[in-house]
Amino acid sequence: MSTSEDLLKSLKVIPVVKLDRAEDAAPLAKALIAGGLPAAEITFRTACAEEAIRTISSRFPEMFVGAGTVLSRSQAEAAIRAGAKFIVSPGLDVSVVRFCQEEGVPIFPGCVTATEVQQALALGLTTLKFFPAEASGGLKAIRALSAPFAQVRWMPTGGVTLENLKEYLAFPNVIACGGSYLVRTADIHAGNWEAITELCRRTLDVIRGAEEESFGFEVMHVGFNQENAAEAKRSAELLRTLFGFHAKETPVSFFSTDRIEIMKKHGAGTLGHVAIGAGDAAAAKKYLEGRGFEFDDSTAAYLPDGRLKLVYLKQEIAGFAFHLLQK
């Protein structure tokens, strides 16, 4: 996966922008950065696109800025000259693709049919725009195309909204979405940059929700610390007497059902620990680290195949240590 594709995967949503005035480029970039989405696809639908890309790329190096609606080699050349870090086209034009490849600039052409996908694959492309997304069948069509073309990663654009974004992002073959809803023409013309920033923040909330759902976070068990094995056994027997929970002994604890663990010693956490299951523990760890949470890597344990099995957060919550657990 290229650096640009890594950025797409990280950002999840690329604001699609139509600017009528080049002077709006700088305040727009500031609004997007403030909202936590430092990216923009500046469409070549207006005469100021090249200048807008140049302004953003030169003054805001942290922005992942590219050109959209690129219909010709000359437009691609102008965009790259202005500092575009990627090119997006509504359809597949072989000459534009080859020019971008020669220049070493990623291009994501629009493909909505099996024939177009095969042509793109023949050109060495595996990340494609699906445009217009909703009008071309939306997620149902993307799922159908992903069956024979499992290696393709999609960037649906056109009809993507805050309301259907989560559904698109939940599909594993969708690397990111293009969203024009983030940057409304009326807000740009009115200089309503706060509205754009707020839409970015609301989008990030949706992205986080989609990511958390994809990990499938759930409580697997709660562990309670005891001072010794005899005390742990007494607690396990009391749970059996009360509720009929049969205890299963392990070298370090008693499990009263799969959800309650009675430790034979004072283990992690002031009071005990909570195991949070995840479909991909390593990816969940990376996701939480990206949000500022720290893990104690010395507690990490691994499965025989090398995958992360469990690792503890450094922070306690309500006296309990928390660890991720691979489902």
Where are these regions (language model features)?
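Glycine-rich phosphate-binding active-site loops on the catalytic face of alpha/beta enzymes
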Residues: P90-V96, K129-L139, N173-A195
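Catalytic cores of alpha/beta
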Residues: L28, S72-A82, T115-L123, V160-A176
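N-terminal beta-strand motif that seeds the catalytic metal site of vicinal oxygen chelate
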Residues: S4-K18, R208-A236, G269-I276
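Vicinal oxygen chelate
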Residues: E213-F215, R259-K264, E289-K327
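Core segments of cupin and vicinal oxygen chelate
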Residues: L28-K30, R45-A47, F217, G223-E261, ...
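Conserved N-terminal beta1-alpha1 strand-loop-helix module at the mouth
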Residues: M1-S74, A78-A82, E102, L162, ...
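Glycine-enriched alpha-helix->loop->beta-strand junction motifs that scaffold or abut catalytic
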Residues: I33-P38, R59-M63, R81-I87, E102-F108, ...
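Catalytic beta/alpha-barrel core
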Residues: V16-K18, A39-T46, M63-L71, A84-L92, ...
